[in-house]
């Protein structure tokens, strides 16, 4: 497929036809999977060549989803945490096989494995630390995530579920601890480090660690599958 330098890729007839086909497929999948809305962007050679929203960002007021709708990214946050850790490693501020307690003296978790090695940063990132999936706090029942203080205090009552490196077990708690290491090694809050060293350099102006009131009108409201 040949495209002249002065022609936008999205204006190419073949590309336009494929985009229309893609849009039809997306709409059919939304119906099949009961998806209320989504946004999609396509980047080619560092240029955004396609961006569009489908469906609704809020079912209650039938607000249309657009290319500017923002979403809670949940566990995709782990990508930012891992990136921050690797940046700090490259800066010589930590090593992946350093024990967690070298940076976080308060990191103490009960264990029934007396000869287990110390938990390392690498194990946090690879879900092989032996830590439970969640912090010892019932936020799944009251929709409230634990604060930093609550997470640290809760560690006193938690127990390793297996010895480090024994197996793989997905752990949100492990990445929360990794975020604390980012803050300690960088000498600044996690949110500040991510914003200065990842989001700003990439021009991710609509991505924030904490929700901003100015984003409220653009934020998609989640819903359970039976509500959609």
Question: Language-model segments: which ranges?
Answer:
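Bacterial Sec-dependent N-terminal signal peptides
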Residues: 1-7
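Residue-level signature of the cytosolic catalytic core of signaling kinases
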Residues: 11, 18, 22, 34, ...
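Short, conserved catalytic-motif segment at the N-terminal edge
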Residues: 15-73, 106-109, 153-159
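Extracytoplasmic/secreted envelope proteins and their assembly/folding machinery
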Residues: 19, 23, 27, 82, ...
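Active-site SXXK
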Residues: 26, 40, 46, 70-99, ...
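Alpha-helix C-terminal capping/helix-coil junction sites
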Residues: 30, 89-90, 194
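Short, surface-exposed loop or secondary-structure junction motifs
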Residues: 58, 112-228
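Short, glycine/proline-biased beta-turn/loop segments that scaffold the active-site neighborhood
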Residues: 96-112, 201-202
């Amino acid at each position: 497929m040949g495209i002249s330098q002065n022609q936008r890729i999205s204006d190419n007839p073949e590309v336009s036809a494929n985009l229309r086909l893609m849009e039809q497929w997306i709409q059919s999948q939304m119906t099949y999977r009961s998806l209320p809305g989504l946004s999609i962007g396509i980047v080619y050679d560092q240029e955004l060549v396609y961006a569009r929203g489908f469906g609704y960002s809020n079912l209650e007021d039938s607000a249309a989803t657009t290319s500017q709708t923002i979403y809670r990214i949940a566990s995709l946050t782990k990508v930012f945490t891992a990136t921050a850790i690797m940046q700090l490693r490259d800066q010589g501020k930590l090593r992946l096989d350093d024990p967690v307690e070298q940076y976080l003296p308060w990191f103490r978790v009960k264990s029934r494995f007396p000869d287990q090695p110390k938990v390392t940063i690498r194990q946090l990132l690879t879900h092989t630390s032996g830590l439970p999936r969640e912090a010892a706090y019932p936020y799944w029942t009251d929709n409230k995530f634990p604060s930093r203080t609550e997470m640290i205090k809760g560690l006193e009552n938690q127990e390793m579920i297996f010895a480090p490196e024994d197996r793989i077990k997905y752990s949100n708690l492990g990445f929360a601890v990794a975020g604390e290491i980012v803050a300690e090694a960088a000498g600044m809050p996690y949110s500040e480090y991510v914003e200065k060293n990842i989001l700003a350099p990439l021009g991710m102006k609509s991505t924030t660690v904490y929700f901003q009131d100015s984003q409220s009108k653009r934020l998609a409201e989640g819903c359970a599958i039976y509500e959609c």
